[in-house]
Amino acid sequence: MMVALNKTTGDVIWKCSMPESQQAAYGSVVVGKFAGVKQYVQFLPVGLVGLDAKSGKLLWRYERSAKGSPAVIMTPLVSDGYIYSGAFRAGGALVKPVKIHGGFKAEEIYFNIKLPTGLGGVVKVGDFLYGTSGRSLACVDFISGAIKWQESTVESSLLFADGRLYLHAENGEVALVEPSPDGYREKGRFTPPNRPADQGTSKAWAYPVVADGRVYIRESTRLWCYDIKAGK
């Protein structure tokens, strides 16, 4: 179920029950405007869904990028009227919500089981999508779905800031990568010191965060902060 609340009073504005299952997922709700209609989009175990922002009415659903996945984690990426989503053991897909016969449908642009589906999410830089799936980082043409390159690495959460990709891998390593469709260009890599005692049994899943010239890295009970201002 999705619920809209008044941010000041907490009063319920609307509720929308999902078809077949009320199970929640890990990703956040994102907002977009499709065919002139403001919509809230979320990636759930029942699929990618779009709701009318005013009424909460379910406008469309796309199941393929979630079907068969035991863990729907990715926050969908919205850009220029398109939405990318992907889930473990399902695949990655790009859809475009369009009006048809007085309603909406999610028009599939492409689907590929080899596209990024990792829990670390995806980012779009220019015309290209970057994300991990299994043990590889991939660069994908956003509109065509063509894979430009793949590089073997550890599954990572990633962020784009200041012209660079910041990768925080499951094994705790942090890498700095220059985004380019021409190939993998790593600029540096390190492992934070004094990692948690449970590092052998747990995985580092927290996203890196960049703010005010600093990058923040969290793993279990530890938090590291590094100065990344130019010239430092």
PLM feature segments, named:
Residues 82, 91-92, 113-182:
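Loop/turn-rich, solvent-exposed surfaces of beta-rich toroidal or solenoidal domains
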Residues 1-5, 13-18:
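Asp-box/WD-like beta-propeller blade repeats and closely related beta-sheet repeat scaffolds
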Residues 6-9, 52-56, 96-101, 141-144, ...:
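Short loop/turn segments that connect beta-strands within beta-propeller blades
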Residues 92, 172, 180, 200-232:
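Blade-level signature of beta-propeller repeat domains, shared across WD40, Kelch, NHL, RCC1
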Residues 3, 49-50, 93, 138, ...:
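WD40 beta-propeller blade core
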Residues 15-37, 43-44, 61-79, 86-88, ...:
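Extracytoplasmic beta-rich repeat domains
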